[in-house]
Amino acid sequence: MEVILLERVAKLGQMGDIVTVKNGYARNFLLKRHKALRATADNRAKYEGMKADLEAKNIAAKGEAAKVAEKIEGRNVVIIRQASEGGQLYGSVSVRDIMAALAADGVSLSRHQVLLEHPIKEIGQHKITIAVHPEVEIHVTATVARSEAEAERINRGEDINSRQEDQDAAAEAIAAAGEFFDPEAQDETPETEAASEQQ
């Protein structure tokens, strides 16, 4: 089906472009959300009459989106999840989880604005793209961790696989083992003690 785009649509075209798309995509997404019109002769004439108004609305919406983008660009949200020692999550972090974390931080978005290619399945920092307007995209960072303390360590850039507590415990164990097993001490067995007494 041929449609006239009423706004920029990613991977499809700019406002005013006439593009051919599958019927289901046109009916269920583009037409339903008022992102396009069927490319009939009447609608082409209607679009030419609406063009100046649409462009003015788009510029105003883009300006508002730029203000919102400045407020949330570069934010870091922390999402706490259970995970294995290797860092694999038991489950995943989806668009809804990211929306909830941003909402707790005072940012209200729709699920269509959070562009996540696939759910997050491991601990770490993940770059998330947010489309606040069809022509304005920004990035936020989602830090997925097992605890707040681990999230702080991830944000500082520390290696979470080698925990500091584990390293300290290992150092203490080595020190204790060194005191217990003195390498300079002679091996005193009852047989060597008896031999030294006979002399």
UniProtKB/Swiss-Prot annotation:
Matching Pfam families: Ribosomal_L9_C, Ribosomal_L9_N
Q: Which domain of life is it from?
A: Bacteria
Give UniProt keywords alphabetically.
Ribonucleoprotein, Ribosomal protein, RNA-binding, rRNA-binding
Example GO CC term: the record gives: ribonucleoprotein complex
Ranges of compositional bias, category Basic and acidic residues: 149-166
Q: Which residues form the signal peptide?
A: none
Q: Which InterPro entries match?
A: Ribosomal_bL9, Ribosomal_bL9/RNase_H1_N, Ribosomal_bL9_bac/chp, Ribosomal_bL9_C, Ribosomal_bL9_C_sf, Ribosomal_bL9_N, Ribosomal_bL9_N_sf
Instruction: Give one GO molecular function term.
Output: rRNA binding
Q: What biological processes does GO assign it?
A: translation
* Compositional bias of kind Acidic residues: 181-191
Q: Where is this region: Disordered?
A: 149-199
Q: Which HAMAP family match?
A: Ribosomal_bL9 (MF_00503)
Could you tell me which PANTHER family the record lists for this protein?
A: 50S RIBOSOMAL PROTEIN L9
Could you say which protein family the record assigns here? Belongs to the bacterial ribosomal protein bL9 family.
Known role: Binds to the 23S rRNA.
The name of this protein is Large ribosomal subunit protein bL9
Species? Afipia carboxidovorans (strain ATCC 49405 / DSM 1227 / KCTC 32145 / OM5)
The record lists the lineage as:
Bacteria, Pseudomonadati, Pseudomonadota, Alphaproteobacteria, Hyphomicrobiales
Primary gene name: rplI
